[in-house]
């Protein structure tokens, strides 16, 4: 089986599903460790090039794996292109509201809300780093195979021009959307720890997206760490069965201990 099969496998059941807004796509799934809390929290943002046909289900596998390591997970759904209000800025507004909902989760489930890591895969990596530019209280962010340069994603026509559908046009048509949404254009506070993991064998989002981001942001004085996994593809990073997963998991645990 390839790691892309993770998109189709039914995930382990969540402990709870809670709405953070009134739209049917404004909810998240909570998975808790079996031990006693308080637990650190990973808020996960799934990928799918911001399109409605890809939902949070496949990310349930990695969230379940992290809960076995003593970490509570908040697997977030958000409006996507094809949903009413999805795209920019609606998708990002949902992510921001889901992040701001975490203190309520903390009261209900005995979470350590001082230890929150926001993690995103592919398009979710863009949303995670964009969130870090707008929420200075967020001090841990991890992008897995992230779409971290939206102008370059447009130039390469990644996934049939997904970025044009997400932002509502090209860089010349909606330059303000690219400025607001592009992690490469934003500034993350220096106190925020950023980790990027990318597979050298990624044929969906090229690994140089993360490599270039790390180089440029380090040059601006941001706290950025980059790990490239030689044999990993795009989906290996979110598949707990893969050979790449232990490196993802150990990075999460390292960031939580920092």
What is the meaning of each model-derived region?
Residues 54-63, 74-115:
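Catalytic nucleophile-loop/oxyanion-hole region of alpha/beta-hydrolase
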Residues 190, 196-198, 202:
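Short beta-strand/loop motif that positions the catalytic acidic residue
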Residues 34-38, 42-65:
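Short, surface-exposed "cap/lid" segments of acyl-processing enzymes
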Residues 118-120, 144, 197:
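Short beta-strand immediately N-terminal to the catalytic nucleophile in serine-hydrolase-like folds
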Residues 31, 204, 211-258:
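C-terminal catalytic histidine-bearing segment of alpha/beta-hydrolase fold enzymes
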Residues 130-174:
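Hydrolase active-site cap/lid region
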Residues 1-36:
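N-terminal cap/lid segment of alpha/beta-hydrolase-fold proteins
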Residues 120-130:
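Glycine-rich nucleophile elbow surrounding the catalytic serine of serine-hydrolase chemistry
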């Amino acid at each position: 089986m390839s790691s892309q099969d993770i998109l189709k496998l039914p995930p382990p059941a969540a402990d709870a599903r809670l709405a953070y807004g009134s739209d049917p796509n404004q909810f998240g799934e909570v998975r808790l460790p079996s031990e006693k809390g308080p637990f650190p929290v990973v808020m996960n943002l799934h990928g799918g090039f911001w399109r409605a046909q890809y939902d949070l289900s496949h990310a349930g596998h990695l969230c379940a794996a992290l809960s076995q390591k003593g970490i509570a997970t908040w697997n977030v759904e958000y409006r996507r292109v094809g949903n009413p209000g999805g795209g920019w800025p609606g998708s990002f507004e949902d992510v921001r509201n889901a992040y701001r909902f975490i203190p309520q989760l903390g009261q209900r489930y005995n979470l350590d809300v001082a230890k929150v890591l926001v993690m995103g895969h592919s398009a979710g990596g863009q949303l995670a780093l964009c969130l870090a530019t707008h929420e200075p209280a967020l001090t841990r962010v991890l992008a897995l195979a992230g779409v971290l340069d939206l102008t370059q994603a447009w130039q390469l026509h990644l996934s049939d021009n997904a970025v044009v559908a997400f932002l509502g046009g090209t860089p010349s048509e909606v330059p303000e959307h690219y400025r607001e949404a592009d992690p490469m254009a934003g500034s993350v506070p220096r106190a925020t720890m950023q980790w990027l993991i990318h597979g050298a064998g990624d044929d969906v989002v090229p690994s140089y997206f993360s490599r270039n981001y790390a180089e440029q942001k380090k040059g601006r004085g941001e706290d950025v760490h980059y790990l490239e996994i030689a044999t990993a593809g795009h989906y290996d990073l979110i598949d707990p069965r893969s050979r790449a997963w232990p490196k993802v998991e150990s990075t999460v645990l390292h960031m939580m201990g920092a």
